[in-house]
Amino acid sequence: MSKLVTFSQQRSAWLILMFSALGLEASALYFQYVMLLDPCVMCIYIRVAVLGLILAGLVGSIAPRFWIVRFLGMSLWGVSSAWGAKLSFELYQMQANPSPFSTCSFYPEFPTWMPLDAWMPSIFMPTGMCSDIPWTMMSLSMTQWTLIAFVGYSIAFLLFIYPGLLYKKPTNPYS
């Protein structure tokens, strides 16, 4: 347990979170602009959850020894990983059990104070259909891979929530 406490208070732990999520975001942009796979509105929402993980890693890496910074990072991490898993599962259900009554919107519904689709339409404007499964790897769709990734982030969050929020009194090497 003490190793988890120590690791959660190191900048490298938070940078691993940030760069792994950055890799997912880079993959999404590769699929969109190199492989020409159009993202659906649910894919855009999942992309926002990945950005939440990037932000969580960035916040946590600023000053990981301070409890309040770890708390903010852990909060962003928990919300983003759970929300991403929920969205990935909903999209998987739409693709696995297609129904004409269960479709997704063509336009994202971002809050008026944060219209990401207007600010950065090249990243946050959906152009695809939720029911399409344009890519698979090892018999799993992109949606299933994102679900696996978010479940992994959620499990890692659950492993780190308790040790990450424990207060560890700094030791004085001169005493």
Curated annotation (Swiss-Prot):
GO terms assigned for molecular function: electron transfer activity; protein-disulfide reductase activity
InterPro entries in the cross-refs: DiS_bond_form_DsbB/BdbC, Disulphide_bond_form_DsbB, DsbB, DsbB-like_sf
Regions crossing the membrane: 14-30, 49-64, 72-89, 145-163
Gene3D superfamilies the record matches: DsbB-like
A GO cellular component entry from the record: plasma membrane
Disulfide bonds: 40-43, 104-130
The organism's place on the tree of life at top rank: Bacteria
GO biological process annotation, one example: protein folding
Pfam families registered for this protein in UniProt: DsbB
Subcellular localization(s) per the UniProt record: Cell inner membrane
Signal peptide: none
Alphabetical UniProt keywords: Cell inner membrane, Cell membrane, Chaperone, Disulfide bond, Electron transport, Membrane, Oxidoreductase, Redox-active center, Transmembrane, Transmembrane helix, Transport
Membrane topology reported for the UniProt record: Multi-pass membrane protein
Periplasmic topological domain: 31-48, 90-144
Cytoplasmic membrane side: 1-13, 65-71, 164-175
Record has Cell membrane as a keyword: yes
PANTHER family in the cross-refs: DISULFIDE BOND FORMATION PROTEIN B (PTHR36570:SF2)
Function summary: Required for disulfide bond formation in some periplasmic proteins. Acts by oxidizing the DsbA protein.
HAMAP family hit by this protein: DsbB
Protein family per UniProt: Belongs to the DsbB family.
Protein name according to UniProt: Disulfide bond formation protein B
Species lineage: Bacteria, Pseudomonadati, Pseudomonadota, Gammaproteobacteria, Alteromonadales
